[in-house]
């Protein structure tokens, strides 16, 4: 596919950029369609995204767009595509650009121009009577847009600032072919069925309340799931030579100034005043881990020190960005901070990567790796950053691991290796990270005494496996569609007495399972067995159902139905041994 670039040239697109350009052009065509249907609409931003495209629209007073209006907008978009309008591009000096946008009543574009650097190039793309300020590139003719669909509408503040006006965000998807679009729409339908918010309600895992937006409540079943995950985390970290610490939730502002968070992260932090002194609720665990290291002298013989922490952190997120467990304002982070000598660095990074790999294999996740380099807003010298990035590269190459470089996406204090999981729907989630930090040991004057009795500065590694525990739980819910493996399932077995005659026997069986350490529930309600089975399978999503009628009472055995709907008869002892083996091996 050829594209029109903002210098006026037309060139063949690299294959990996085709979808992005199609989506960007779809956003312009959607805006043109909306302008035809709602002539007084003003437009803010309309980019392509990893998942589709959107445009933020300011509609006239009293006018609203809902999903009911999508067929009309899509029909107008198809007209524009059929008209096969040519995309053209031109550049204007700042004054002329402002005049053009003012003449067309595009107040948001005028404000955006004012935010640009004085020497910024200002280019416009036009198709038919629609003009949009844009850097491109775009398709050459509207007919090149073959497959698109509008998918949702929501609110979004102008520039993401809650003090600004709330605009209407219209989302869509676009692909090169109808087959790709159909496949994507099927995936979206499947994603709706797997929505962790829906499954979380059905399985009594967690809830959200208006009284605490962005702060999840975990229910009893959710706590079983969460604690089972944490038990697994503690077991594998103990085996890998980690110790566990816990650091305070609230620490004074000076600590965060020393760490660099106050200068680089304060907009995301909550603060309070205690005894006339300003304190911050921690957004990250690392400064607390540094204070633990600094609390006593260290010898080179003690290193590496691997200190893990399941720490509760709080980060301010805009209310409109909150989304179930995926985007919250407080969460538990499975951090660990490693303090190492230079000669230990590569082996420690390799050890961390292998640990993270073992975790993701346990849950059946494929993943790819990115090396994220220095961002614009960062601290430290060029030399330190070069050393840090080289240290991560060396470890990845020693592992023989393929990776992509993600320029400018490192943490403010150091570069990082990011792990992007692929779930059962093919979606990717950034979870695990390994970050190399020369800055915090310098800022806090961390030291150890080397073999030659001189004081040296340790290198610090920050790393997480799950990332946010809450977010990882959300990912697991959708990955497994609530059908967790036996070891992880909040309810591992549900006993279903067919009638009152088998109720006592069902309770006897449950007692044996409970005594063996199996999580079992007895559904002894006076309901038809078919209803109980459907609920256990579709709502509770249990690994095993025990269907217990008069036949089982007489034989003293149980009928076991698994998720394949296959039913087999076995003794209670056989079943207990089977389930315990699955729990032990985390199969």
Q: Residue spans of the language-model regions?
A:
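Conserved P-loop NTP-binding catalytic core
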Residues: 45
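NTP/phosphate- and nucleic-acid-binding module
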Residues: 1-42, 50, 56-587
């Amino acid at each position: 596919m050829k594209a029109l670039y903002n210098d006026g040239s037309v060139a063949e697109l690299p294959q990996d950029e085709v979808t992005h350009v199609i989506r960007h052009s779809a956003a312009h065509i959607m805006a043109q369609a909306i302008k035809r249907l709602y002539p007084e609409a003003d437009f803010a931003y309309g980019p392509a995204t990893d998942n589709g495209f959107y445009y933020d629209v300011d509609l006239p007073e009293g006018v609203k767009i809902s999903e009911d209006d999508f067929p009309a907008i899509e029909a107008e978009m198809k007209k524009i595509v059929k008209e096969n309008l040519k995309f053209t591009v031109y550049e204007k000096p700042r004054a002329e650009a402002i005049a053009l946008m003012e003449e067309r009543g595009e107040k948001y574009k005028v404000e955006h121009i004012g935010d640009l650097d004085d020497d910024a190039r200002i280019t416009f793309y036009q198709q038919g009577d629609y003009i949009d300020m844009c850097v491109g590139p775009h398709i050459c003719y509207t007919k090149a847009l073959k497959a698109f669909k509008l998918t949702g509408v929501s609110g979004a503040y102008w520039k993401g600032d809650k003090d600004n006006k709330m605009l209407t965000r219209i989302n869509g998807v676009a692909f090169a072919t109808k087959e790709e679009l159909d496949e994507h729409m099927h995936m979206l339908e499947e994603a709706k069925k797997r929505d962790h918010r829906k499954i979380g309600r059905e399985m009594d895992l967690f809830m959200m309340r208006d009284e605490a937006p962005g702060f999840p409540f975990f229910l009893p079943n959710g706590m079983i799931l969460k604690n089972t995950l944490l038990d697994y985390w503690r077991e594998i970290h103990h085996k890998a030579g980690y110790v566990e610490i816990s650091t305070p939730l609230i620490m004074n502002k000076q600590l965060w100034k020393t760490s660099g968070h106050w200068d680089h992260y304060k907009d995301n932090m909550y603060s309070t005043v205690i005894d006339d002194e300003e304190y911050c609720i921690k957004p990250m665990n690392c400064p607390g881990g540094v204070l633990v290291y600094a609390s006593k002298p260290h010898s080179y013989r003690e290193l590496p020190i691997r200190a893990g922490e399941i720490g509760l952190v709080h980060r301010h997120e805009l209310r409109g960005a909150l989304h179930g467990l995926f985007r919250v304002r407080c969460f538990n982070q499975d951090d660990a901070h490693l303090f190492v000598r230079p000669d230990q660095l590569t082996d420690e990074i390799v050890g961390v990567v292998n640990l993270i790999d073992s975790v993701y294999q346990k849950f059946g996740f494929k993943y790819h790796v990115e090396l994220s380099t220095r961002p614009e807003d960062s601290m430290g010298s060029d030399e330190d950053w070069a050393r840090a990035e080289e240290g991560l590269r060396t470890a990845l190459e020693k592992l023989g691991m393929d990776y992509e470089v993600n320029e400018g996406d490192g943490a403010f204090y150091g570069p990082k290796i990011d792990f992007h999981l692929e779930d059962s729907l093919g979606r990717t989630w950034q979870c695990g990270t390994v970050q190399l930090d020369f800055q915090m040991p310098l800022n806090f004057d961390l030291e150890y005494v080397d073999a030659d009795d001189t004081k040296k500065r340790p290198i610090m590694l920050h790393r997480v496996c799950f990332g946010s525990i809450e977010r990882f739980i959300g990912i697991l819910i959708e990955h497994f569609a609530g059908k967790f493996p036996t070891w992880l399932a909040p309810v591992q077995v549900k006993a279903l007495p067919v009638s009152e005659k088998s109720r006592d026997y069902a309770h006897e069986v449950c007692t044996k399972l409970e005594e063996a350490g199996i999580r079992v529930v007895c559904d002894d309600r006076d309901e038809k067995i078919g209803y109980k089975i459907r609920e256990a399978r579709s709502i509770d999503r249990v690994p095993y159902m025990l269907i217990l009628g008069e036949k089982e009472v007489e034989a003293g055995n149980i009928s076991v139905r698994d998720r394949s709907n296959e039913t087999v008869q076995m003794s209670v002892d056989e079943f207990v041994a089977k389930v315990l083996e699955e729990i032990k091996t985390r199969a």
